[in-house]
Amino acid sequence: MASQTIAVACSIDDRYALPLAVMLESLAACLSPPWQMRVYLLHRNLSQPVRDGIASLVDLHPITLSGTCLGRLPRDHRYPLEAAAPLFLPVLLPADIGRVLFLDADMLVLDDIGPLWSHDLAGRAWAATVDPAIPLCRSPRGVPRSIGRGIPADAPYCNAGVMLIDVEAWRQRGVAERALDFIGRIADRVDFLHQEALNATAWNDWTPLDPRWNLPATVGRRFDQTSVEAAAAPGIVHFAGRMKPWRMRIAGRFADPYARVLARVVDRLPAQNRTMRDALVSLYDRVLRDWCYPWERFIWERRLL
């Protein structure tokens, strides 16, 4: 049986090297023949030990982000410049790449991504899941109404952590260029960077994926509203937010599966120091969060967190 290649793209700085290793190790472990993957890693200045560690796990093709690209992004302490790298995929990927699967580093893959890769885009520029925390463009922390005039009230809002992208459609329709222009216009007000920009400028050019391909890691906790159907067979779990399982002990059903994969890769990369802040966030997540979540959500929706 001839192998078939899945093009995977990721973007990190050194701080996210370890979770990227976990995500790629879990992805490779779940991938079934005839699929194989080639990983395009967008970065600014990753250290050689980090690149070597990742390359020991997968077929790695590093791509350096140029100053020309990064110069179009706002300097924001909340995000590393690499966070918006998906917007540069149409100009940085090899010309023969027609489809690419972009994955955030803070994920755990639990099922074969072959069916995800084969998803029918139905003529749209990309596929993604509806963001469970921001289900509509008009939801709190979605696209501000003053900016998103013309977007229907019921337009869904996508999470950019998993995106199956038609690269040629992005080029021809100027998807990334429009998003970059949006970021440039409202640099001091943009909230979720490229995710907000894509939802604001191309809200009608993406198609939804099954939620199981980008499930919040809080599935099963008393405050989580994820549907039972989506939670029954998770394909990819997303550790979005401040609770990062490579830095701290966390609560929830995916803490142990993550720890098992982490143990397989941790020695391949430079060690990361844990801080007192990590310890306090861990304590909050494991002991207090189930009871304090309504307040957390209240603060988050008002962009105070």
Locate predicted features.
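Short, charged/polar "capping" segments at the starts of alpha-helices
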Residues: 45-52, 136
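Short, acidic, metal-binding catalytic loop of nucleotide-sugar glycosyltransferases
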Residues: 26-35
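Short internal beta-strands
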Residues: 37-45, 128-130
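Active-site-proximal specificity loops/subdomain of glycosyltransferases
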Residues: 49-92
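Short Gly/Pro-enriched turn/cap motifs at secondary-structure boundaries
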Residues: 78-79, 151-155, 187-189, 226-228
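GT-A fold catalytic core of metal-dependent nucleotide-sugar glycosyltransferases
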Residues: 62, 82-138, 164-165
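Conserved catalytic core of nucleotide-sugar-dependent glycosyltransferases
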Residues: 118-181
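A glycosyltransferase accessory/donor-loop signature
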Residues: 1-12, 22, 160, 165-305
